[in-house]
C-alpha cells in the first residue's frame, strides 16, 4: 500500500491551529480570564482615578488685601534669644519695650543648644531668635505656626484650601520680623522706622482663571494604560515558549507544519482578541471621564495598534528564551521599563523634542507619547479627533504610523530570530538565509529507491552485520554512513555517536537497542532533523537530513513518536488526533475516519473524550503513537513507544506496527528486549555510541547467545543431584542457573542441539526423578544484549588499562564472582543489637541532623524566612529613620530675593520672575530703582493694580507715600510660599539703603523640631508589635512542615517500615525547629524593644512576655506538626499554611481591637477565646497587652480597663495548648502515620483494642483454578496449625478490599468497587513471589495493605510470625524492607546521606555503616553517584537506591513494587542478579510486583497472576507455561542459495512433523511457525525430527522454544476480560485512579 507525499496548504494549517489555540484559550480559563479582565480592571481603575483627580478649574481671583499688621497676633509670646550680647540685648530690649510692649516676654539663652533643649518643653507660643551677627538672625517658630516645606512653590489647589504663604502674616512672623528689622535699623542709624514698617500692607495677588493639571495622576494613567495590555503578551509568550520547552513546536514541524501557519495562527487569534478588547475599552474610555472629548475611533486606533504591537513584541522575545517562566517576567518588566522611559520623556520639559522619536521603535514609549498627546488635547477641550491628528507637540499621526510599523517589524524579527537563533533542537539557517536564491525558489525532488551505490559507495558488511536477503537489496530507505555527534557538556566534548554506519530497509521493522545514554535518541533526532550530525552522512530516500530544505521534504513522509509525550494537555484525545491529522495534511473528509481507525487500533475509544493531561503514562504513550501513525506515513520513527504500557497495551501496539509495516519503514528504540525480539525484523545494537551488531534475532542469538534454557517443574521428592548428573551425562556443557524447591533451570549450549533429543528421551523415561513437567526455550535477546554490553566494557578497558586483551570468559567470570561476593555480603548486613532507648536516641539525633541540613539546603524556605525577617527589620529601620529624621527634614530657609526674583539679564525660570513695581506715591522713586539695581533684582514697572494682566509674577511692591518716607504694600503670589517675608526683608533693606547703610539685613526661617506626639508614638509601637505578630506567625510553616513533604513522597512510610519510632521522629524535628523559632523571635522582639527605647519598662511585665514566649514557641511548632497532616493535596503546602497563619493573626488583631470600641468586656472575652483556641495568637495578645501596660500615663481604672487580665491568659494558654497538641499529635500519628514496626517507648497506643474485622468465607467458585484453590487451603491449614515447624514469612488469608464510589443519585445508593476478591497466598522463607497483573488488577492494593497504608475490608495478613494487626505491640519484626513504585527519596539529599539516615534508623552503628555503604556501592555500581543529590540521579540509579535502602538491616520481609522500572536492560539485569543473590538460601521472604514478564521469570521462585482483583493462577514459571502455554514457536533460517522448490518441500515437511502448525509472516530466508501444544507430544521426538530436517534441507539454523510467560499472561488476561465483559463485571483494562488516601475512583 503506497502513500503519496503529503502536501498541505498554509491556510488550512492556519485554520487548524486557530481552532487549537481557541480551544486552549477556552480551557485555560485562568489565563484567559486574566487577559480579558486585566485591561478592563485597569481601565475602570483609571476612570476612577480621573474622577477622583479631575482637572481643577479656578476662576479669576481679584487682589485680596489682608488685615493690617497687628502686634497682638503675638500676644503672650515667649521670645527666647541667643547669644546674649550687648547688641542682641539692645535689639531685644527695643522689640519688647518699644515695638511690642505688653505683648511678649523675652528669655535669654547662652547658646542655641540650650534653646533647642528648652523648646522641647515649651508650649507652641514659644519663638526663638538666633543672632548670627548684628545684621543677620534666624527666626524659629514651631512647625504648626509657619510652613516647614522646602518646596518654594505651592499649587493653586494648596493655596485655595489654606494658603501657606499667608501664614507668615497671620502667625505674626512678619510682625516680629519687621520689629527686629526696625530695631536693627534704629541701632545702626539712630532712626526709628517702626511706624513705617508697621504700616506695611499685605495683599494677595489676584490670579487668572486657570485649569490646574496634576501630573501624578497623569503619570499613573499613562503607566497603567501601558501595563493594561501586558497580559496578552505575557501569556502568549509563556504559551509559545512552553510549547518550545516541551519540544511540541519542533515535532509539529516534523509533521509538516509551516512556520508561516504557526505565526499566522497566533497573529490572527490575538488580532481578534485585541480588536474586541480595544473596541470595548475605547467606547468605555470616551464615554467616561477618561477621554470624554476624544473620538472613539481615534482612541480605538491607538489601543488596537498598541495592543497589536505589544503582543508582537512578546512574539519577538520568544525565540530568545528557552524557559517559559523567564520570558513572561522579562516581557512584563520590559513593558514597565519602557513605559517609564516614555513617561520620563513627557515629564522632562527640557528633553529635546527632536530626540523623542528616537524611542519610537519601542511601542511602549510611542504609546505613552500618543496618550500624552490625547490628554494634552483633552486639556484644551478639543480631544483627539481626525481633524487634529497632526496638531500638538507630538502629532498623533506619527504615533499611529510608528505603532503600525512596529507591529510589522516585530513580526518579521520574530520569524527571523526563530530561523537563525540556535536552539536545543531543530535545524537553523544562516544569518543571511533570506538573501539566498535557493530560499525563494525551491526545486522539488521526488524521493527515489536508492541502489547500493547511490550514497558514499557500498557500506561494507562485516561479521557484525547480517546481510539482508535478496528481496531487500535496493530497498535501502535510510542510509547512515559515518555519523558522529559530539556535544559540549561542562566544557568537555561528549561523543554521543561514533562513526555509525548501517542501512535501514523498506518493508522491515528495525529496532535500536542499547542501554541509556548510548545514542539511540540522538540518532532518532538526527534522522528526523531535530539536530544536525557533527560529521558523517544520513539520508532518507535520498534526502539529506543535514540540509534544511531537503529535510523539509523528507519530513512529509515521517511520523514520529519521541520519548516525550507530544500532545496538547487541555485537549481531549480525539481533539489531539483530529487537529494533528489536519496539520499532517489528511483530507478533511477523511479525518474522522482516520481518527476513529487510530482510536480503534490502539483501543482508545473509552478515553477519547478525556483530556490528555488526565491520562495515565501508558495512555499518553498510546496517544503519542496514534499521532505518529496518523495518515499512514511512509516512515515511522518511534523512540520507546511502549514505555509505561502494560503487557496488553504493548501487544496492541505490536499488532498495529506489524499490520502497517508493508512497504514502509519502521524504526523504534526500546529497553524491552522481548519487544525487539518479537516485533523487529532487524536489530541494531548500539553501545557507547558505536554499532555492535545488526541482524535478525536468530543471527544475534546464534552468534552471541548462551544457548537454550531447560526449565523443570519438580516435586518435593526430586533427586536434584541425580537429575543434574543425567543432564550432564547427555550435555556436558550444561550449567545449573536456578534452583528452588519447585523448579530447576539449566543452560544448554547451542553446539549440543543434536543431543537434545537424547536428553529429553532420558527425562521422559526416568519418571522416578521427580520431574512433573519440563520445557525448553531459546536464549533471549536480553542475554545477547548483556553479552554485548560486557564486551563493550572490555573494549573500553582495553584502551585505558590492559596491554593484552584478557579472555572474555575470564573477565565475565571474574566480574560476576566479585559481584556475587558483594551481594552475599550485602545480604548479610544486620542492624546492631542495641537497646530500645539507645536506638531511640540514635534515631532522634539522626532525624534532627537530617532536618537541620534539609533546612539549609531548602533555599526557597530559607529565602522566605529571610524575606519575612527583612520586611520586619526594614519597616523597623524605616520608621526609626523617619522618627529621627524630622530634625534633618527641618532645613533653614534663607529668605533672600534670589529665591523668586530674576537678576538683570537672566532668562525666565520655573518660578523666578521680575519684581513688579507700582508707583502710587505720585513722586520720583529713582532711589528705589537704584536700590533694586544695587541688589541685582530685575524690576518691571506697572501703572495700576491689574496684576492679572501681566501674570504670572512672583510678587509686587506698591509704593505709597507717607509723612516721613515711603510706605509699601507687599503684594505676593499665594503659590510662592516665602514671597511675603522676602518682600518685608526687601523693604527693610531699602530703608537701610535710603539711610546710606550699605549692609543688608539677612533672615532665615527655621522651624523648631517637634518630638512625635505620645499618641503617634503609641500607634507606631502598636503597629510594629502587630506587624511582628503577623510576620512571625508566617514563619513556622517554612521550616516545620517537613512532615507534609515526607508524606507526599511517601518517605515517612518508608522510615516507619524501616523501624523509625514516631516519638524520635517528632522530637528530632522539634529539637531543631523550637530553638530556631525561639532565636528568630528573640531577634525580632529584641529589635522591637531596641528601636523603642522610650518604652516604659517593667521587669515583672517583661518576665511575663518571656514566659509567654517560652510556651508559645513549642505550642506553635507542635500545632504546625498537626497541621501538616491536613490538606496533603495542596501543591504548595508551606506557602498555603504561611498565608493562613498570617491572615488568622491579622483577623484576630482586627476583631479584638474593633470590638474594644464596642466594649471592654466583649474585647476581653474574644481575647480569652483567641488565646485558648487559636495557638498563633497568645504571643501577639501578650505583646500588645504588655505594650499597653507599659505606655506612660495609661489609665489605671481597673473597672474600665485592666491589661493585666489580658496578659495573664496569654501567658498561661500556650502551656495548656502544648499538652493538648502532644495528645493530638499522638492521635494523628496513630490515625494517619501508618504502621509502626517497633514499639515506641513514649508514644503509647491510644487504643489497645484490636479491630473486629470480619473474616467471612469466600464464595464458592467452581471455575477457580485448582492451584489457587490449593493455595487457599494451604493457608487455611497453616493458620490453624499451632505446632508447625516453620510458618511462612507472609500469609494472606481471604483478603478482600472494597471502595465506596461516588453515590449513584438515580438509584440512591453507593456503588461498591472491588479491588481485591478474597485473595489467599503465602510466601515461604527464602522465596520470592511475583505478583503480576494488568493495571487495576489489585497488586498495589495488596502491597498497600501489607505496608499498612490502607485497611482491608475483610481478611487477615500475617507478617513474620505475627499478625499485622498486632505487630505494633510486638517487637519481633524489627524492620520491613519496602521498595515502593514511586521513589520515596529526598531530592536535595545525597545518595550517601540516604544510606546513613536509613542505616541509623535501622539501628546500625556509624562504624558498620561506613563498611556497608562501601559494599553496597561496589555491589550495585553506585560509587560514582555517592555524593550526588537525588534530583541529579538518573531514574535507574534512583531505583537501585530504593532497592538498597529496602535491603539494609537484613529485613525478614521485603516488598518490591516494580523495582526495575525505568532501567535499561543492563541495569535491570544488574538489579535482578542483586535480588536473586540477596534472597538466595536466606531466611527472608519477598513479594515482587512487575509488568515485565522477563523480570518475573528471571527473579521469582513462584508467580501469581491477578486479573480484576482475583488470583487467576499461581505456581512456578515452568508450571504456568506447561499448564497455560498455547504451544511452541519455530523459526528456521535458510541458506542463501536455497531454491523455491526446496522451500516448498521444507514447508511440507514441517506440516508433516507438526500437522497443525500455522505459518507466520516470513521472508524468503526466514520461516516462522506457531506450533500448537497438541502437536508436541514429546520434546525429544520434536528435536530429533527437526535435526533430521536440518541435515536433509538447506537449513542454516533453527530455534524451537516454548511459549513465554508474557504470552501466558496475555492469554490469561484476554480470557478473563472476555469473561468479565460477558458477566458485566469490572473490566480489567480500565485504569483506576488512586488518591493519597487510597480511595479508588472507577
From Swiss-Prot:
**What is the membrane topology listed in the Swiss-Prot or TrEMBL record?**
Multi-pass membrane protein
In this record, what's one Pfam family? ABC_tran
Q: Which InterPro entries match?
A: AAA+_ATPase, ABC2_TM, ABC_transporter-like_ATP-bd, ABC_transporter-like_CS, ABCA, P-loop_NTPase, R2_ABCA1-4-like
TM segment ranges:
32-52, 220-240, 264-284, 297-317, 328-348, 355-375, 396-416, 866-886, 967-987, 1021-1041, 1071-1091, 1102-1122, 1139-1159, 1169-1189, 1207-1227
Q: In which tissues is it expressed?
A: Ubiquitously expressed. Highly expressed in testis, skeletal muscle, kidney, liver and placenta. Expressed in both the epithelial and mesenchymal compartments, present within the outer root sheath (ORS) of the hair follicle as well as dermal sheath. Expressed in multiple regions of the brain, including the hippocampus, superior frontal and inferior temporal cortices. Strongly expressed in neurons and moderately in microglia, with only weak expression in astrocytes and oligodendrocytes.
Gene3D superfamilies given in the database record: P-loop containing nucleotide triphosphate hydrolases
Question: Which keywords appear in this protein's UniProt record, sorted alphabetically?
Answer: ATP-binding, Cell membrane, Endosome, Glycoprotein, Golgi apparatus, Lipid transport, Lysosome, Membrane, Nucleotide-binding, Repeat, Translocase, Transmembrane, Transmembrane helix, Transport
Kindly report the protein's main subcellular placement as a broad class.
Golgi
Q: Where along this sequence does the record place binding of ATP 1?
A: 514-521
Does Transport count among this protein's keywords?
yes
Positions that bind ATP 2: 1333-1340
Enzyme Commission code: 7.6.2.-
Q: Name one GO cellular component term.
A: Golgi membrane
Q: Where in the cell is it found?
A: Golgi apparatus membrane; Lysosome membrane; Late endosome membrane; Cell membrane
Give me any GO biological process, just one: cholesterol homeostasis
Q: What is the role of this chain?
A: Cholesterol efflux transporter in macrophages that is responsible for APOAI/high-density lipoproteins (HDL) formation at the plasma membrane under high cholesterol levels and participates in reverse cholesterol transport. May play a role in the processing of autolysosomes.
Similarity section? Belongs to the ABC transporter superfamily. ABCA family.
UniProt name for this protein: Cholesterol transporter ABCA5
Q: Please report the organism this UniProt entry assigns to the protein.
A: Homo sapiens (Human)
Amino acid at each position: 500500500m503506497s502513500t503519496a507525499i503529503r502536501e498541505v496548504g498554509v491556510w488550512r494549517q492556519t485554520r487548524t491551529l486557530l481552532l487549537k489555540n481557541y480551544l486552549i484559550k477556552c480551557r485555560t480559563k485562568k489565563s484567559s480570564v486574566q487577559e480579558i479582565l486585566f485591561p478592563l480592571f485597569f481601565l475602570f481603575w483609571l476612570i476612577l482615578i480621573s474622577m477622583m483627580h479631575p482637572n481643577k478649574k479656578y476662576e479669576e481671583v481679584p487682589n485680596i488685601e489682608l488685615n493690617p499688621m497687628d502686634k497682638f497676633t503675638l500676644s503672650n509670646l515667649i521670645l527666647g534669644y541667643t547669644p546674649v550680647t550687648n547688641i542682641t540685648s539692645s535689639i531685644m530690649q527695643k522689640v519688647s519695650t518699644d515695638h511690642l510692649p505688653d505683648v511678649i516676654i523675652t528669655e535669654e539663652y547662652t547658646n542655641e543648644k540650650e534653646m533647642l533643649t528648652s523648646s522641647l518643653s515649651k508650649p507652641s507660643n514659644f519663638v526663638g531668635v538666633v543672632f548670627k551677627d548684628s545684621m543677620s538672625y534666624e527666626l524659629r517658630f514651631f512647625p504648626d505656626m509657619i510652613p516647614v516645606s522646602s518646596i518654594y512653590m505651592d499649587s493653586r489647589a494648596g493655596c485655595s484650601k489654606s494658603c501657606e504663604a499667608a501664614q507668615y502674616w497671620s502667625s505674626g512672623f512678619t510682625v516680629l520680623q519687621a520689629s527686629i528689622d526696625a530695631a536693627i535699623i534704629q541701632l545702626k542709624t539712630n532712626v526709628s522706622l517702626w511706624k513705617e514698617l508697621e504700616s506695611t500692607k499685605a495683599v494677595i495677588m489676584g490670579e487668572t482663571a486657570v485649569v490646574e493639571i496634576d501630573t501624578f495622576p497623569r503619570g499613573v494613567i499613562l503607566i497603567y494604560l501601558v501595563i493594561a495590555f501586558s497580559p496578552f503578551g505575557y501569556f502568549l509568550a509563556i504559551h509559545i515558549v512552553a510549547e518550545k520547552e516541551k519540544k511540541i513546536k519542533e515535532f509539529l514541524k516534523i509533521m509538516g507544519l509551516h512556520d508561516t501557519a504557526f505565526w499566522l495562527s497566533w497573529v490572527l487569534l490575538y488580532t481578534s482578541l485585541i480588536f474586541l478588547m480595544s473596541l470595548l475599552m475605547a467606547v468605555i474610555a470616551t464615554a467616561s471621564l477618561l477621554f470624554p472629548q476624544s473620538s472613539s475611533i481615534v482612541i480605538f486606533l491607538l489601543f488596537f495598534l498598541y495592543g497589536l504591537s505589544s503582543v508582537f513584541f512578546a512574539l519577538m522575545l520568544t525565540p530568545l528564551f528557552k524557559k517559559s517562566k523567564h520570558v513572561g517576567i522579562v516581557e512584563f518588566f520590559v513593558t514597565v521599563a519602557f513605559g517609564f522611559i516614555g513617561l520620563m520623556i513627557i515629564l522632562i520639559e527640557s528633553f529635546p523634542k527632536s530626540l523623542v522619536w528616537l524611542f519610537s521603535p519601542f511601542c511602549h514609549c510611542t504609546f505613552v507619547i500618543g496618550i500624552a498627546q490625547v490628554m494634552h488635547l483633552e486639556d484644551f477641550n478639543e480631544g483627539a479627533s481626525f481633524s487634529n491628528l497632526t496638531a500638538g507637540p507630538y502629532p498623533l499621526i506619527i504615533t499611529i504610523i510608528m505603532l503600525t510599523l512596529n507591529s510589522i517589524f516585530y513580526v518579521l524579527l520574530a520569524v527571523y530570530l526563530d530561523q537563525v537563533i540556535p536552539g536545543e533542537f531543530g535545524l537553523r539557517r544562516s544569518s543571511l538565509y533570506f538573501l539566498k536564491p535557493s530560499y525563494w525558489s525551491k526545486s522539488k525532488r521526488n524521493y527515489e529507491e536508492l541502489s547500493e551505490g547511490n550514497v558514499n559507495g557500498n557500506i561494507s558488511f562485516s561479521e557484525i552485520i547480517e546481510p539482508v536477503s535478496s528481496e531487500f537489496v535496493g530497498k535501502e530507505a535510510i542510509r547512515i554512513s559515518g555519523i558522529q555527534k559530539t556535544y559540549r557538556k561542562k566544557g568537555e566534548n561528549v561523543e554521543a555517536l561514533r562513526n555509525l554506519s548501517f542501512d535501514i530497509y523498506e518493508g522491515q521493522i528495525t529496532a535500536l537497542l542499547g542501554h541509556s545514554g548510548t545514542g539511540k535518541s540522538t540518532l532518532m533526532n538526527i534522522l528526523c532533523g531535530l539536530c544536525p550530525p557533527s560529521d558523517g552522512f544520513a539520508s532518507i530516500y535520498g534526502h539529506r537530513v543535514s540540509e534544511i530544505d531537503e529535510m523539509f521534504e523528507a519530513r512529509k513522509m515521517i511520523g514520529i513518536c519521541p520519548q516525550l509525550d507530544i500532545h496538547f494537555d487541555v485537549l481531549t484525545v480525539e481533539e489531539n488526533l483530529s487537529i494533528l491529522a489536519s496539520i499532517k495534511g489528511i483530507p478533511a473528509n477523511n479525518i474522522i475516519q482516520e481518527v476513529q481507525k487510530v482510536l480503534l487500533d490502539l483501543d482508545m475509544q473509552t478515553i477519547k473524550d478525556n483530556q490528555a493531561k488526565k491520562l495515565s503514562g501508558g495512555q499518553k504513550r498510546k496517544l503519542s503513537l496514534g499521532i505518529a501513525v496518523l495518515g499512514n506515513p511512509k516512515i515511522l520513527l518511534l523512540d520507546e513507544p511502549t514505555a509505561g504500557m502494560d503487557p496488553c497495551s504493548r501487544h496492541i501496539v505490536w499488532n498495529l506496527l506489524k499490520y502497517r509495516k508493508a512497504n514502509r519503514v519502521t524504526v523504534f528504540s526500546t529497553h524491552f528486549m522481548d519487544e525487539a525480539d518479537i516485533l523487529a525484523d532487524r536489530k541494531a545494537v548500539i553501545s557507547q555510541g558505536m554499532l555492535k551488531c545488526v541482524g535478525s534475532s536468530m543471527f544475534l542469538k546464534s552468534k552471541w547467545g548462551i544457548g537454550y534454557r531447560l526449565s523443570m517443574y519438580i516435586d518435593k521428592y526430586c533427586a536434584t543431584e541425580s537429575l543434574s548428573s543425567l543432564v550432564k551425562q547427555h550435555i556436558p556443557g550444561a550449567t545449573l542457573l536456578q534452583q528452588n524447591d519447585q523448579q530447576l533451570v539449566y543452560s544448554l549450549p547451542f553446539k549440543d542441539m543434536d543431543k537434545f533429543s537424547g536428553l529429553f528421551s532420558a527425562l521422559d523415561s526416568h519418571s522416578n526423578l521427580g520431574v512433573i513437567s519440563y520445557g525448553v526455550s531459546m536464549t533471549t535477546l536480553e542475554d545477547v544484549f548483556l553479552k554485548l554490553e560486557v564486551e563493550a566494557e572490555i573494549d573500553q578497558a582495553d584502551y585505558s588499562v590492559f596491554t593484552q586483551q584478557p579472555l572474555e570468559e575470564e573477565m565475565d567470570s571474574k566480574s560476576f564472582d566479585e559481584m556475587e561476593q558483594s551481594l552475599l555480603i550485602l545480604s548479610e548486613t544486620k542492624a546492631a543489637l542495641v537497646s530500645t532507648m539507645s536506638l531511640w536516641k540514635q534515631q532522634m539525633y539522626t532525624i534532627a541532623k537530617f532536618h537541620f541540613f534539609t533546612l539549609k539546603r531548602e533555599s526557597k524556605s530559607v529565602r522566605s524566612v529571610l524575606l519575612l525577617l527583612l520586611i520586619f527589620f526594614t519597616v523597623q529601620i524605616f520608621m526609626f529613620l523617619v522618627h529621627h529624621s524630622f530634625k534633618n527634614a527641618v532645613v533653614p530657609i534663607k529668605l533672600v530675593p534670589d529665591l523668586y526674583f530674576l537678576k538683570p539679564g537672566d532668562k525666565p525660570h520655573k518660578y523666578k520672575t521680575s519684581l513688579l513695581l507700582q508707583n502710587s506715591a505720585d513722586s520720583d522713586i529713582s532711589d528705589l530703582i537704584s536700590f533694586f539695581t544695587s541688589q541685582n533684582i530685575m524690576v518691571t514697572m506697572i501703572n495700576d493694580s491689574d496684576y492679572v494682566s501681566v501674570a504670572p509674577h512672583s510678587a509686587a511692591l506698591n509704593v505709597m507715600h507717607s509723612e516721613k518716607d515711603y510706605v509699601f504694600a507687599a503684594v505676593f503670589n499665594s503659590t510662592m510660599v516665602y514671597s511675603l517675608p522676602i518682600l518685608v526683608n526687601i523693604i527693610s533693606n531699602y530703608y537701610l539703603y535710603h539711610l546710606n547703610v550699605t549692609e543688608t539685613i539677612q533672615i532665615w526661617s527655621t522651624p523648631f523640631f517637634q518630638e512625635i506626639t505620645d499618641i503617634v508614638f503609641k500607634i507606631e509601637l502598636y503597629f510594629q508589635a502587630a506587624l511582628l505578630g503577623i510576620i512571625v506567625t508566617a514563619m513556622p510553616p517554612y521550616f516545620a512542615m517537613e512532615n507534609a513533604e515526607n508524606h507526599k513522597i511517601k518517605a515517612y512510610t518508608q522510615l516507619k517500615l524501616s523501624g523509625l519510632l514516631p516519638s524520635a521522629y517528632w522530637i528530632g524535628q522539634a529539637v531543631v525547629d523550637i530553638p530556631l523559632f525561639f532565636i528568630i523571635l528573640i531577634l525580632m522582639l529584641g529589635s522591637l524593644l531596641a528601636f523603642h527605647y522610650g518604652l516604659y519598662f517593667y521587669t515583672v511585665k517583661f518576665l511575663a512576655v518571656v514566659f509567654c514566649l517560652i510556651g508559645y514557641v513549642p505550642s506553635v511548632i507542635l500545632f504546625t506538626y498537626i497541621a501538616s497532616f491536613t490538606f496533603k493535596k495542596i501543591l504548595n503546602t508551606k506557602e498555603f499554611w504561611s498565608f493562613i497563619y498570617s491572615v488568622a493573626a491579622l483577623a484576630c488583631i482586627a476583631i479584638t481591637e474593633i470590638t474594644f470600641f464596642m466594649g471592654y468586656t466583649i474585647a476581653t472575652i474574644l481575647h480569652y477565646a483567641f488565646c485558648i483556641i487559636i495557638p498563633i495568637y497568645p504571643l501577639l495578645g501578650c505583646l500588645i497587652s504588655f505594650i499597653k501596660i507599659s505606655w506612660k500615663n495609661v489609665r489605671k481604672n481597673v473597672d474600665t480597663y485592666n491589661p493585666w487580665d489580658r496578659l495573664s491568659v496569654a501567658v498561661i494558654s500556650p502551656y495548656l495548648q502544648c499538652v493538648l497538641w502532644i495528645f493530638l499529635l499522638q492521635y494523628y500519628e496513630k490515625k494517619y502515620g501508618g504502621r509502626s514496626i517497633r514499639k515506641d517507648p513514649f508514644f503509647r497506643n491510644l487504643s489497645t483494642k484490636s479491630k473486629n474485622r470480619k473474616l467471612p468465607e469466600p464464595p464458592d467458585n467452581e471455575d477457580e483454578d485448582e492451584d489457587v484453590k490449593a493455595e487457599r487451603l494451604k493457608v487455611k491449614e497453616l493458620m490453624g496449625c499451632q505446632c508447625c515447624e516453620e510458618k511462612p514469612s507472609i500469609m494472606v488469608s481471604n483478603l478482600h478490599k472494597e471502595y465506596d464510589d461516588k453515590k449513584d443519585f438515580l438509584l440512591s445508593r453507593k456503588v461498591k468497587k472491588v479491588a481485591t476478591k478474597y485473595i489467599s497466598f503465602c510466601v515461604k522463607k527464602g522465596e520470592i513471589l511475583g505478583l503480576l497483573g494488568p493495571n487495576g488488577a489489585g497488586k498495589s492494593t495488596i502491597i498497600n495493605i501489607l505496608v499498612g497504608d490502607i485497611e482491608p475490608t475483610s481478611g487477615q495478613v500475617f507478617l513474620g510470625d505475627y499478625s499485622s494487626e498486632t505487630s505494633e505491640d510486638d517487637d519481633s519484626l524489627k524492620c520491613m524492607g519496602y521498595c515502593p513504585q514511586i521513589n520515596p527519596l529526598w531530592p536535595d539529599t545525597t545518595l550517601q546521606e540516604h544510606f546513613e539516615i536509613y542505616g541509623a534508623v535501622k539501628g546500625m552503628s556509624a562504624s558498620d555503616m561506613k563498611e556497608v555503604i562501601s559494599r553496597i556501592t561496589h555491589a550495585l555500581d553506585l560509587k560514582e553517584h555517592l555524593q550526588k543529590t537525588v534530583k541529579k540521579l538518573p531514574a535507574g540509579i534512583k531505583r537501585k537506591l530504593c532497592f538498597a535502602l529496602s535491603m539494609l538491616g537484613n529485613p525478614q520481609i521485603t516488598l518490591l513494587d516494580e523495582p526495575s522500572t525505568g532501567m535499561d536492560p543492563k541495569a535491570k539485569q544488574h538489579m535482578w542478579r542483586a535480588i536473586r543473590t540477596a534472597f538466595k538460601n536466606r531466611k527472608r521472604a519477598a513479594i515482587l510486583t512487575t509488568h515485565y514478564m522477563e523480570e518475573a521469570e528471571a527473579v521469582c521462585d513462584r508467580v501469581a497472576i491477578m486479573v480484576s482483583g482475583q488470583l487467576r493462577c499461581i505456581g512456578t514459571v515452568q508450571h504456568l507455561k506447561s499448564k497455560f502455554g498455547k504451544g511452541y514457536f519455530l523459526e528456521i533460517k535458510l541458506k542463501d542459495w536455497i531454491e523455491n522448490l526446496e522451500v516448498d518441500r521444507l514447508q511440507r515437511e514441517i506440516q508433516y512433523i507438526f500437522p497443525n502448525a500455522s505459518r507466520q509472516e516470513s521472508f524468503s530466508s526466514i520461516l516462522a511457525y506457531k506450533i500448537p501444544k497438541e502437536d508436541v507430544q514429546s520434546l525429544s521426538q520434536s528435536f530429533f525430527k527437526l535435526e533430521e530436517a536440518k541435515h536433509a534441507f538447506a537449513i542454516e539454523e533453527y530455534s524451537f522454544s516454548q511459549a513465554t510467560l508474557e504470552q501466558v499472561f496475555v492469554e490469561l488476561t484476554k480470557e478473563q476480560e472476555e469473561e468479565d465483559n460477558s458477566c458485566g463485571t469490572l473490566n480489567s483494562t480500565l485504569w483506576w485512579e488512586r488518591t493519597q488516601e487510597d480511595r479508588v475512583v472507577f
